[in-house]
């Protein structure tokens, strides 16, 4: 349908903007590390905290049942189906590198936060109703980032949570579940 074509074009445009922004962030981090600035974060292989109070996965990593490409993360439905407001927590210690409101940048992701945990590891928290953090903030595992919502391209209150690895040369989304089960 025309709506699906328009959505796919918007998603592709958002992905290109995001790729450019992440490349810029990664280059800045690598330059700081190369200049001798001690990174404030070094992911040490520890176990992640589950990012919200609900454990109801509504779309798993890699799912293709209702999309044209594999799902890059997991969707976690609200405790009360369709009702925004569940707290969203940092899965691990890190630095907030993106804290966007829907109107500012990516319409498909809605309000979202991205955290750099060190060693090329990032987590993203999409479709938030509101944000409690801003770019540059150091966050700790379990710290509240905002609340679950229904912003962007979303069909009900949920959290899209994903894990991305970026070594400055290649970027890939990976299954987040093993980070919780170490």
Q: Where would I find each of the regions flagged by the language model?
A:
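A generic structural motif
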Residues: 26, 61, 80, 100, ...
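Conserved, short, structured surface segments that act as functional micro-motifs
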Residues: 107-119, 137-182
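Proline-centered structural pivot motif
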Residues: 49-54, 58, 172-177
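A structural signal for short beta-strand/turn segments enriched in small hydrophobics and glycine
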Residues: 57, 88, 94-96, 136-148
């Amino acid at each position: 349908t025309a709506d699906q074509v328009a959505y796919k074009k918007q998603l592709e445009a958002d992905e290109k903007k995001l790729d450019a922004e992440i490349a810029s962030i990664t280059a800045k981090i690598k330059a700081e590390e190369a200049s001798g600035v001690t990174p404030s974060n070094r992911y040490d292989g520890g176990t992640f905290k589950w990012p919200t109070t609900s454990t109801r996965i509504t779309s798993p990593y890699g799912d293709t049942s209702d999309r044209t490409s594999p799902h890059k993360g997991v969707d976690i439905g609200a405790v009360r189906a369709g009702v925004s407001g569940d707290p969203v927590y940092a899965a691990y210690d890190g630095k907030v590198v993106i804290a966007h409101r829907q109107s500012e940048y990516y319409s498909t992701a809605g309000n979202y936060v991205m955290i750099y945990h060190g060693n090329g590891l990032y987590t993203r928290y999409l479709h938030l109703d509101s944000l409690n953090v801003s770019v540059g903030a150091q966050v700790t595992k379990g710290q509240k980032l905002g609340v679950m919502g229904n912003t962007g391209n979303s069909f009900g209150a949920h959290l899209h949570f994903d894990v991305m690895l970026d070594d400055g040369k290649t970027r890939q989304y990976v299954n987040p579940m093993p980070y919780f089960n170490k």
